[in-house]
């Protein structure tokens, strides 16, 4: 779980490196769906260029404003940070790219997002930040052209309340496969009145929650099909492992804190709050949830673990967490 803290630290370090490599105009302009704060500037002798960063994460706006101010104070290079409203990044980016002072630093979410902006991207192959990567897996590239650099690596799986799991008579060592997970979850459901908790938090289909299943869970059948077929891209999947996807979804909704009929209205906050209240053992989410689950009145590190989303495919005992990024910086 402490990987979240490491990711944030790396994010800050990468930010300083990336800002140092940017030039051009910073006149971003106002939009109705963004926060635009220009850092106070102190021009240093010999300072050239400026930076306009279109930020994706509203919850990190203040940190970026602080970093921009500190960078300007140190270098004299003016930095503008505009933060798009939640869920409006792509539309804001389209609007800003049409202006004379387009962003010098922006974000794409991977190959799909890159398709729209490839022609705008500076090749980072010879940059200092690319040279600092420990693996090309952290770069968004085609052939020898580097279009983007991952700036945070995160993991997701099943977050486990170990205390509740042990109260049900199990430990995480008892769960090494989908069959094991199914056995434990269904046993907890059968004894839920006695135990006082369910197996899984609600798998809400509200927009604040459904991405966990429409994107994160849906990655698994695609990943395993790619692995089986030895490919890295395809125009259409064959659906080899869609039955596994359905089986996992059925396990979630039939062993949950709520009736499946209620899922359309359940939110991400509902799922998190159920886990915090000790209403369920398992919570599908990722390392970014660490701060929400710990701290004052929350869990300790000893209370929590994260296990893979076992899918009934391959060598499950050696399966790891789903790890990667959908956050790439482009210049």
Regions found by a protein language model. Give the residues of each.
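Conserved N-terminal structural module of periplasmic/extracytoplasmic solute-binding proteins
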Residues: 4-8, 22-113, 126, 264, ...
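Short helix-initiation/N-cap motifs at beta->coil->alpha
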Residues: 83-92, 178-180, 262-277
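Short, solvent-exposed loop/beta-turn-alpha elements that line the ligand-binding surface or hinge
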Residues: 123-137, 200, 204-207, 222-247, ...
């Amino acid at each position: 779980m402490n990987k979240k803290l490491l990711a944030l630290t790396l994010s800050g370090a990468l930010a300083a490196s990336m800002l140092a490599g940017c030039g051009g105009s910073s006149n971003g302009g106002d939009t109705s769906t963004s926060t635009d704060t220009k850092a106070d500037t102190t021009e240093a002798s010999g300072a050239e260029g400026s930076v306009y960063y279109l930020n994706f994460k509203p919850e990190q706006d203040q940190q970026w404003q602080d970093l921009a101010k500190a960078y300007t104070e140190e270098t004299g290079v003016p930095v503008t940070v505009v933060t798009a409203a939640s869920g409006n990044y792509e539309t804001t980016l389209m609007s800003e790219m049409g202006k004379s002072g387009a962003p010098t630093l922006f974000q794409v979410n991977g190959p799909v997002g890159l398709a729209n902006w490839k022609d705008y991207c500076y090749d980072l192959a010879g940059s200092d930040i690319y040279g600092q990567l420990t693996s090309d897996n952290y770069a968004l590239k085609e052939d020898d052209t580097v279009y983007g650099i991952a700036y945070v690596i995160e993991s997701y799986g099943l977050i486990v309340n170990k205390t509740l799991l042990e109260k049900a008579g199990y430990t995480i060592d008892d769960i090494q496969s989908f069959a094991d997970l199914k056995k434990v979850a269904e046993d907890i459901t059968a004894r839920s009145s006695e135990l006082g908790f369910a197996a899984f938090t609600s798998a809400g289909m509200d927009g604040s929650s459904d991405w966990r299943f429409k994107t994160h869970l849906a990655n698994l059948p695609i990943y395993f099909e790619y692995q089986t077929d030895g490919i890295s891209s395809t125009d259409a999947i064959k659906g080899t492992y869609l039955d596994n996807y359905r089986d996992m979804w059925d396990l979630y909704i039939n062993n949950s804190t709520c009736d499946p009929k209620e899922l359309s209205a359940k939110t991400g906050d509902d799922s998190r709050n159920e886990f915090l209240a000790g209403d369920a053992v398992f919570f599908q989410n990722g390392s970014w949830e660490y701060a929400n689950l710990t701290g004052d009145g929350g869990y300790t590190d000893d209370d929590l673990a994260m296990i893979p989303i076992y899918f009934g495919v391959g060598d499950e005992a050696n399966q790891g967490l789903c790890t990667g990024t959908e956050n790439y910086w482009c210049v």
